[in-house]
From Swiss-Prot:
Enzyme Commission number(s) of this protein: 2.1.2.9
Key words of the record: Protein biosynthesis, Transferase
A GO molecular-function annotation: methionyl-tRNA formyltransferase activity
Short name of any one Pfam family annotated for the protein: Formyl_trans_C
Organism encoding this protein: Rickettsia sibirica
Recorded catalytic activity of this chain's protein: L-methionyl-tRNA(fMet) + (6R)-10-formyltetrahydrofolate = N-formyl-L-methionyl-tRNA(fMet) + (6S)-5,6,7,8-tetrahydrofolate + H(+)
Protein name in UniProt: Methionyl-tRNA formyltransferase
Entry-linked InterPro entries: Formyl_trans_C (IPR005793), Formyl_trans_C_sf (IPR037022), Formyl_transferase-like_C_sf (IPR011034), Met-tRNA-FMT_C (IPR044135)
Domain of life of the source: Bacteria
């Protein structure tokens, strides 16, 4: 899970990409919600905002704009 705009968002489905990056862990590195992590990239596929239904990434990003270079916690 991660926090964004004071809301907890659960990652329900994701894919790990074994790829190099030079970003701080938690940094959004694409507009498709790919997140830098320790030694690779996490591509989020499905998530759920607190008190809302689960959404695939396309549906979620239509209503929530998480900008590239945002650092998630």
């Amino acid at each position: 899970y991660f926090s964004y705009n004071d809301k907890i968002i659960k990652i329900l489905e994701a894919e790990y990409l074994n790829a190099d990056h030079h970003c701080t862990s938690g940094t959004v590195i694409s507009d498709k919600l790919e997140i830098a992590c320790g030694s690779g990239i996490l591509r989020v596929k499905k998530l759920q905002q607190e008190s809302k239904k689960a959404l695939n990434i396309e549906e979620f990003l239509r209503g929530t704009n998480i900008l590239k270079d945002t650092v998630l916690k």
